[in-house]
């Protein structure tokens, strides 16, 4: 954990209470059914904190993001922002949220208008929200923001179009368009997955710098637990629409409780200089779709511990709730946490 992470101020900015998101199946025998993509998700995000949502593709991470940002209607539960219920925000309340909560999506090229220069891309955010002291004031804000996200010389970059920028520069430009509004919360949905490995570290450092200098809270969404370890204060592991483990990032990596988290941790590369070696845990098959969620513990068909314990009936029939194992801040949804220690 970095010094910046350790000094992150406490206090709830965002709270999810039993959030549910459903979609209607579009085809096949289940076409009339509602598919529950997110099912009873609860967590909080503190002011100035970075929380990572980690899980495989299709686990519900993006559905959570879209519900928070009011890009999707939720099917149940509540989303609280600064203590106010924004679950079904409309009108002026929704317009304010569009400024206070910014989303950075994984593909920067799709997020940018190819007809706009870098300057116009960032300035558009100010114009839409009627921010800035005239044309000269907005120009100064845009150029300052471009410099702050590492796009320099700003005067030169400002005149370029998206196709004239590298992948890393495009993602920095997207971040500049978000941060120029001084949001309280930035949701970064797989922000480096489309970038070369050589560019990822720079974007991750940028996010840490923005948190330190501007006090922004970040919800960092990724399928890669090793990236979450680098940037996050806490990690929430998501599987088939549920949080199966949540706790401090260092503790999740050092002592994972849930068998699914253990499998994710087992594939994190270990530096050659360390004497510690991890045995890679292989999971059976692919995660089921949200339309075919197993009864009981939804992870049990792929769970190594379930097989190791002789396939207990409880795993097949009872849905486990998040529960602590010693540390009340580190919880996991497993009937046999003690056996997994």
PLM region spans:
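Charged, flexible cofactor/metal-binding loops and thiol motifs
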Residues: 9-12, 26-29, 248-341
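P-loop NTP-binding/switch modules centered on Walker-like glycine-rich loops
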Residues: 56, 195, 199-278
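ABC ATPase NBD coupling module
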Residues: 28-32, 86-102, 128, 135, ...
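Conserved ABC ATPase "signature" region
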Residues: 85, 136-156, 209, 265-266
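A short, proline-enriched helix->beta-strand linker immediately N-terminal to the Walker B motif
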Residues: 180-184
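Helix-to-loop junction immediately C-terminal to a conserved catalytic motif
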Residues: 69
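Conserved ABC transporter NBD signature motif
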Residues: 77-85
């Amino acid at each position: 954990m970095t010094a910046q992470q350790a000094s992150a101020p406490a206090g709830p900015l965002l709270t999810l209470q039993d959030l549910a998101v459903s979609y209607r199946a579009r085809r096949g025998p289940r076409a009339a059914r509602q598919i529950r993509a997110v099912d009873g998700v609860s967590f909080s995000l503190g002011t100035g904190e970075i929380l990572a949502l980690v899980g495989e593709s299709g686990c519900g991470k993006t559905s959570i993001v879209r519900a928070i940002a009011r890009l999707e209607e939720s099917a149940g539960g509540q989303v609280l922002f600064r203590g106010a219920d924004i679950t079904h925000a409309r009108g002026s309340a929704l317009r304010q949220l569009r400024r206070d909560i910014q989303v950075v999506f994984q593909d920067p090229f799709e997020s940018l208008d190819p007809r706009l220069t870098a300057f116009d891309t960032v300035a558009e955010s100010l114009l839409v929200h009627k921010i800035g002291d005239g044309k000269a004031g907005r120009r100064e804000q845009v150029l300052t923001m471009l410099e702050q996200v590492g796009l320099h010389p700003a005067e030169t970059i400002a005149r370029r179009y998206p196709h004239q920028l590298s992948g890393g520069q495009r993602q920095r430009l997207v971040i500049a368009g978000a941060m120029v509004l001084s949001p309280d919360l930035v949701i970064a949905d797989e922000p480096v997955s489309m970038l070369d490995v050589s560019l990822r570290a720079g974007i991750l450092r940028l996010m840490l710098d923005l948190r330190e200098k501007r006090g922004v809270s970040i919800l960092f969404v990724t399928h890669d637990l090793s990236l979450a370890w680098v940037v996050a204060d806490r990690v929430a592991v998501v599987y088939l629409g549920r949080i199966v483990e949540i706790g401090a990032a260092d503790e999740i990596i050092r002592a994972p409780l849930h068998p699914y988290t253990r499998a994710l941790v087992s594939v994190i590369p270990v530096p050659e200089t360390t004497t510690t070696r991890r045995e890679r845990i292989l999971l059976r098959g692919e995660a089921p779709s949200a339309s075919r969620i197993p009864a009981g513990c939804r992870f049990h068909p792929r769970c190594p511990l379930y097989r190791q314990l002789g396939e207990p009936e409880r795993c097949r029939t009872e849905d486990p709730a998040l529960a602590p194992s010693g540390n009340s801040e580190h919880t996991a949804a497993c009937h046999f946490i003690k056996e997994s220690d």
